[in-house]
Amino acid sequence: MTGFVCRVWSSTHQERDPVRRRLFAAAMLAVVAATGLSACGDSDPNVLKVGTEGTYAPFSFQGSDGKLTGYDVEVIQAVGDKLGKRVEFVQTPWDAIFAGLESKRFDLVANQVTVNDERTAKYALSAPYTTSAGVIVTRADNNAVTGLADLNGKTCAQSATSNWSKVATDAGAKVEAVEGFVQAIQLLKNGRVDATVNDNLAVAEYTKKTGDTGVKIAARTGSVSKQAFAARKGDALITDVDNALNQLRADGTLAKISEKYFGTDVSQ
C-alpha cells in the first residue's frame, strides 16, 4: 500500500487543479479509513478467547483424539454456551498465562487459578468452580517428609508463578522451576528434587492414569483452596461469567462435569 500511494502521489502532486487535489485527498482518506477499520475488525464479540495450558490433566489436556479436553475446558465451554459465545482456546504455558491475559491475547484464563489475596487484587476473579486440597508428593522410598514443615531446606519442583510454588517457598523449600506437573514428577523420579506440591485432584488423576508406584502422597499441606476463572481487572465479562456459573450450578451441569472427571462433586 505504501508503494502504491507514493507512485500515485508522484504522478499527481504537480497537478495545479484544486478539484483534482481534493478528489485525491478524499480517495486517500477513504483508503486509510478502510485499512483502519479492517485492522480493528479482528475482535469478534461472539467469540470468547480463553487461555489454558493444555498440559494439566484432568483440567486442561489433549485427549486421545488430539483435541483439547478436561474439567476446566468443559466448564468454560458450558459458560460460553450460556453466554452465546463460541469458545476459542489459546494454549499457553502457565508461567506466561497471566502475561497473555494482560496483553489481551485472550479474555479469560481457565486453568485452575487458585484464589488468593494477590490475584484478587490484580485480576477480576469469578466465583470458584473447584475446591481442592494441597498435597506433598515424594518418591515412594522417601520417608523424610511427613508434613509441610519437613520441606524446609528441601528442593521442590514447581511452576514458578503457581500458588503451590508459594506454598513450598513459605515452608522454607528451594524451588526448581518447571513448566508443569508432569515435568515436576520427572525431576522427582530422577532424584533431582525432593518433592513437589500440587493439587490432590491432579495427583489422583496422574496415579490413576499411569499406575506409577514410584511416587506417593507423603502429606497434606493442611490447606483447602478454591479455583476460579481470571479476567482483567475491571472487565465486566466476569459478571457475565458468574451469572453463567450460577445457572450451571443450579441446573446440575457443574456437578455432572465434576462427576465425569473426579467421581464426586468438587464444584462446591
What kind of region is each of these model predictions?
Residues K49-T52, L148-T161:
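Short loop->beta-strand "edge-of-pocket" segments that line small-molecule binding or catalytic clefts
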Residues G84-R86, S103-N111, K154-T155, N190-A202, ...:
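Alpha-to-beta junction loops
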Residues T35-A39:
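C-terminal motif of bacterial Sec signal peptides marking the signal peptidase cleavage site
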Residues G41, V73-K82, N142, S162-N163, ...:
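Extended ligand-binding regions for polar small-molecule ligands
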Residues Q77, R86-D150:
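Acidic, polar ligand-binding/catalytic clefts
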Residues V73, F89-L101, N143, T161-S162, ...:
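Short helix-initiation/N-cap motifs at beta->coil->alpha
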Residues D44-Q112:
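Extracytoplasmic small-molecule ligand-binding "clamshell" domains
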Residues T131-T138, A204-N246, T264-Q268:
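Periplasmic-binding protein-like
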